[in-house]
UniProtKB/Swiss-Prot annotation:
Protein name: Rho GTPase-activating protein 4
Limits of the Rho-GAP domain: 138-319
Superkingdom per UniProt: Eukaryota
Keywords: GTPase activation, Stress response
Origin species: Arabidopsis thaliana (Mouse-ear cress)
GO molecular function: GTPase activator activity
Record lineage: Eukaryota, Viridiplantae, Streptophyta, Embryophyta, Tracheophyta
Entry keyword annotation includes Glycoprotein: no
Amino acid sequence: MAKVLKSSQSCHFPSPSSSSSTSCGGGNDGSNRDPHSPFNISRREEEEEEEERSEKERERFELSSALEILVSAIRRSVIGGCVGEEDLCSMEIGVPTDVRHVAHVTFDRFHGFLGLPVEFEPEVPRRAPSASATVFGVSTESMQLSYDTRGNIVPTILLMMQSHLYSRGGLRVEGIFRINGENGQEEYIREELNKGIIPDNIDVHCLASLIKAWFRELPSGVLDSLSPEQVMESESEDECVELVRLLPSTEASLLDWAINLMADVVEMEQLNKMNARNIAMVFAPNMTQMLDPLTALMYAVQVMNFLKTLIVKTLKDRKESRDKLVPASNPSPRDHNGDQSSSRQLLHLMKANKEETLDNFEAEMKDKEESADEEEEECAESVELVDIKKSSLVNNSSGGFGQKHIGWEEQRTMSKASSIVGRVNYRVELFEAWR
């Protein structure tokens, strides 16, 4: 009873001390209304955790379903590839395991790819005449190579420049390879050469300068593989030839091409005023690369002598080869191969005609001499008759008329005989002169 009264009193008579108890007594109703109560906060956290768990379970389910679909697809493809049915296996892409697709195409550094389908052509960019962006200052390994007339493998751009230099009469121009071209035109021609084009209105001096520049701008000089001591010690032609054989194949081909180019220039020395020493002097600094300018200048003198010796030897070899082609003077109508040359045949034909003409002339002169002898005999007989008549007339006649008549007959007979003898002597002199 006491407890009930107390509870009723606390409910009907609020007091400051009982206010808290009232709030506590009515906690079940107030807890649902106050959002900041500890009970509501914990419940809200539980609900969020449940939602997170449900989302994770949903993601796991979706992932597992996707994996199951992927695994089933792979399983079907593998099973389909392993099935013994030929039709099914032929349709599968992954069945061939050892397949090679070989395509043969032609690559032209001047015009790009050749032989590709038409639909691929617009996508293929045009390339420079070498694998690099320029033909100057790059290695010969990255350039298009061709064979020259001597079988040397050299860059195609060098052969193009050489051909244009020869066709434009550059070898006959005075000071070729010594006189430099215009800088502005040289830069323009460089750009055109990088495109694989040589302009038509090019100056031969500019073209010759670009040939020297090509050698000068190589990553490594043509003679850099040889030591300066080896070059200095090579003085004779045989020593220089042996030294050239020590060069790598690429450098040896480039040097042989350059030496023959310089020899062609020297053969036109009367027109271009460039002898072996002059052309070797302008090419020597372009064949080596040294950091020290003074050392490079001193070494260039030795290289000049080396190049000069090779040029002179090349000219000698050319002269010997030309002499072998021309048949030597031989009295025999046949040469060392047993064949008759056209000039030899013509010479013998002219000689035979001359001998035949002389024989005919001798026969004719012999006939005329015989006729002249007969005439002389007749003249002699007539002279004897005249003498006889003269003596008879002198002895028998006593007047001057008879003497006058005898003198006229004698003069006429003697003049006729002398004219015949003179004509015979003239024929003999003519025959002797013809001999």
